[in-house]
From Swiss-Prot:
Top-level taxonomic group: Eukaryota
Protein's cellular compartments: Secreted
Protein name listed in UniProt: Antibacterial peptide PMAP-23
Species annotation: Sus scrofa (Pig)
UniProt key word Signal: yes
Family the entry assigns: Belongs to the cathelicidin family.
Length: 153
């Protein structure tokens, strides 16, 4: 009788462990990679944009140090560039060519890697193009001193 109870108890524990094993992998499968989270942020940027063309990821800065919790907001920094695809086409931006002399924006903010929540807090600012002539003028132009130190004996 005692062995039947022990066997029944062991069977229940085995069932619980099996169920737990099925649940844990599905939870970890819902975490996005850093790049996937940024690509979703770019998609959200395109959805909310009022500009004529889609933007596509141009450059992604290094991901932050590993953090085990996918629900913790991660800092991101990336650059997007305007493509030739009009926004209403709803074509994936990855399939669009970059527009020659298209706008470039630097984006910073935070993303969460949890697929369910997928929170994004991103701000993008257009980068100013600098002509080489302007840059050379700034470098060669003599700088006026802002202050002078005079030593008196």
């Amino acid at each position: 009788m005692e062995t039947q109870r022990a066997s029944l108890c062991l069977g229940r524990w085995s069932l619980w462990l099996l169920l737990l094993g099925l649940v844990v992998p599905s939870a970890s499968a819902q975490a996005l990679s850093y790049r996937e989270a940024v690509l979703r942020a770019v998609d959200r940027l395109n959805e909310q944009s009022s500009e004529a063309n889609l933007y596509r990821l141009l450059e992604l800065d290094q991901p932050p140090k590993a953090d085990e919790d996918p629900g913790t907001p991660k800092p991101v920094s990336f650059t997007v560039k305007e493509t030739v695809c009009p926004r209403p086409t709803r074509q994936p931006p990855e399939l669009c060519d970059f527009k020659e002399n298209g706008r470039v924006k630097q984006c910073v903010g935070t993303v969460t890697l949890k697929e369910i929540r997928g929170n994004f807090d991103i701000t993008c600012n257009q980068l100013q193009s600098v002509r080489i002539i302007d840059l050379l003028w700034r470098v060669r132009r003599p700088q006026k001193p802002k202050f002078v130190t005079v030593w008196v004996r």
